[in-house]
């Protein structure tokens, strides 16, 4: 699995991907036509491409053997948007990895201390809670476009890369002998 920032030319494909996932898995969760209209207007590929070009939006993609299997976008203000994972790739940690990647981007590139997301449909708040987000609204739910959502926040994170180091066996022996000497003397 490879996660990378999408190029401007790839944004239209990411929009089509997100729209197809929305239509398959999410559209039925919303009750109002207003919610559907809002989504359709938001997912205008030309507008999102322009926002990416202007530095207002960044979109990451998750790829399995060069096949797009997940997308996640974030505004330059740290608001996470467009988290979609293809149903065939659910429960493999792809959404979590995409969220980690945008949180790292928020800290390292945008110098933001926290990010936000509107968990919509509202039942997705459980998922976001499991991956480190907390409700930002005391009442829990807000009403937007006639459907409920949960505003949530999480701290942005530093990218930490641990490089494994080989420690010689003699080092462990020396540490063990030193510890034993301290214990008995």
Regions found by a protein language model. Name each.
Residues 43-60, 79:
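A short helix-loop-beta-strand connector motif used in the catalytic cores of GNAT acetyltransferases and
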């Amino acid at each position: 699995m490879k996660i990378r920032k999408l190029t401007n030319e790839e944004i239209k494909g990411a929009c089509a991907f997100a729209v197809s996932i929305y239509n398959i898995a999410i559209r039925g969760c919303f009750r109002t036509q207003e919610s559907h209209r809002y989504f359709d207007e938001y997912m205008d590929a030309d507008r999102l491409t322009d926002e990416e070009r202007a530095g207002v939006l960044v979109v990451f993609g998750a790829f399995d053997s060069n096949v797009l299997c997940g997308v996640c976008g974030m505004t330059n203000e740290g608001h996470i948007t467009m988290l979609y994972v293809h149903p065939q790739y659910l429960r493999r940690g792809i959404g979590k990895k995409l969220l980690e990647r945008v949180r790292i981007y928020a800290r390292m590139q945008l110098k933001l201390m926290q990010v936000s997301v509107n968990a919509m449909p509202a039942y997705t708040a459980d998922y976001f809670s499991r991956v480190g987000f907390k409700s930002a609204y005391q009442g829990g739910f807000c009403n937007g476009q006639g459907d409920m959502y949960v505003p949530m926040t999480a701290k942005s994170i530093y990218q930490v890369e641990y490089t494994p180091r080989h420690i010689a066996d003699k080092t462990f022996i020396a540490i063990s002998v030193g510890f034993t000497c301290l214990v008995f003397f």
